[in-house]
Design a protein with these regions (language model features):
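Conserved active-site segments centered on acidic
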Residues: 1-59, 121-122
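Phosphate-binding/catalytic loops
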Residues: 63, 69-123
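A short linear-motif detector with a strong N-terminal bias
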Residues: 42-45, 64-68
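Functionally constrained cores in energy, signaling, and assembly domains
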Residues: 22, 30, 35-37, 47-48, ...
Length: 123
C-alpha cells in the first residue's frame, strides 16, 4: 500500500520500501486474508515474501516505521544500538489481523490506508 501511495505521489524513485517482521519466518507468502484485502484495492501480494528483521537490515534503512508502538519498543530492545530513526504508525492504532478472518485483514488495511497521507507527508 505504501509503494502504491508513493507511486501516486511521484516518490517511488526517491524511496525504497522494505517489509520485515519481528517474528516473521523468511520466505513465506502473504496470508490469504492479506492477499484478498490488497486485491480489493487493485494491488497484488503475489511476489511478496516475508522477511525477519535483522540488525544489518535495520542499519541499511534511513527510517523504520512500525505498525504499533509495541513493535518499535520491541525493536529498540532487540537492537538498542540501532542508529536508525524509528516511528510508530499507530495514531490511531493499526489492528493486528494475524490469525483473523478476511474482515480482520480488511480492517487492518483500512487502518493503514487511513494513515498513509500522514506518513507520506512525514517522508
Amino acid at each position: 500500500m505504501l509503494r502504491a501511495a508513493l507511486k501516486e505521489h511521484g516518490m517511488m524513485d526517491e524511496i525504497q520500501v522494505l517489509s520485515a517482521g519481528t517474528y516473521a519466518l523468511s520466505g513465506a507468502t502473504a496470508s490469504t486474508g492479506a492477499q484478498r484485502a490488497m486485491q480489493r484495492r487493485g494491488l497484488s501480494l503475489a511476489d511478496h515474501r516475508s522477511r525477519a528483521v535483522t540488525g544489518v537490515l535495520l542499519e541499511t534503512c534511513s527510517l523504520i516505521v512500525g505498525l504499533t508502538q509495541s513493535h518499535i519498543n520491541q525493536l529498540r530492545m532487540m537492537y538498542p544500538d540501532c542508529p536508525t530513526p524509528m516511528i510508530a504508525f499507530d495514531d490511531p492504532p493499526v489492528s493486528d489481523p494475524y490469525g483473523g478472518d478476511d474482515a480482520a485483514y480488511e480492517q487492518a488495511a483500512c487502518d493503514i490506508q487511513r494513515q498513509l497521507p500522514a506518513l507520506i507527508q512525514h517522508l
